[in-house]
């Protein structure tokens, strides 16, 4: 979806991908599932839904499309910490990416997290984040230093503990604002 922060697209471009945008649903601001299949080409390798403002993209039809075309799902959950889709956490449908930047619902000051239930992907990500090193001075690939510091981990742990309370407060605020807006004449 083009309705996201540039970092989403930068990650794809840095991986050598060609990005093909699909518009958003005007109600949810998430990927418009009805447009996805028409955008798929023989070169397509993944669908990258963006979960936005705590709202999950419509994952069931996206998963069906991905399965039908043998595509990966790479979720941008940077603005949806703790969000659910039919009882399942966003970031659990394929490879999920979360941002811990200071403006997010949960922060470590900077950085992020990748989630996956694919052991091979998890192994590769661990290598990439630690200079390509599997064991002390055993390097298997080119990597980078993308490790979280102990201080960031401590902040993140504290943030995780209060995340449910934050989410509930945001939901209550949204409900209150919606109620007030509903009273306005258009």
Residue ranges of predicted features:
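PLP-dependent aminotransferase class I/II
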Residues: 34, 46-50, 55, 59-61, ...
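PLP-dependent aminotransferase-like
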Residues: 1-77, 84
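Histidine-centered beta-alpha loop that forms part of the nucleotide-sugar donor binding/catalytic region
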Residues: 3-4, 17, 24, 78-79, ...
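Active-site-proximal alpha-helical scaffold in enzymes
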Residues: 109-116
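Conserved active-site segment immediately N-terminal to the catalytic lysine
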Residues: 75-107, 135-140
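A secondary-structure boundary/capping signal
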Residues: 1-2, 77, 102, 117, ...
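Nucleotide-sugar-dependent glycosyltransferase donor-binding/catalytic pocket residues
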Residues: 5, 29, 54-55, 102-108, ...
């Amino acid at each position: 979806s083009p309705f996201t922060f540039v970092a989403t697209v930068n990650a794809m471009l840095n991986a050598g991908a060609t990005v093909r945008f699909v518009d958003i649903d005007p109600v949810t601001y998430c990927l418009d599932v009805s447009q996805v299949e028409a955008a798929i080409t023989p070169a397509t390798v993944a669908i990258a839904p963006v979960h936005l403002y705590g709202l999950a993209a419509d994952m069931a039809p996206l998963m069906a499309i991905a399965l039908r075309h043998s595509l990966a799902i790479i979720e941008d959950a940077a603005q949806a910490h703790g969000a659910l889709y039919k009882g399942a956490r966003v970031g659990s449908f394929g490879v999920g990416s979360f941002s811990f930047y200071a403006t997010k619902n949960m922060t470590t000051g900077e950085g992020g997290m990748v989630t996956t239930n694919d052991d091979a992907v998890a192994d590769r990500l661990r290598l990439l984040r630690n200079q390509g090193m599997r064991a002390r001075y055993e390097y298997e690939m080119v990597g980078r230093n993308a490790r979280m510091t102990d201080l960031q981990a401590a902040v993140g742990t504290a943030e995780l503990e209060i995340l449910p309370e934050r989410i509930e407060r945001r939901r209550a605020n949204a409900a209150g604002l919606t109620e007030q807006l509903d009273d306005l004449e258009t």
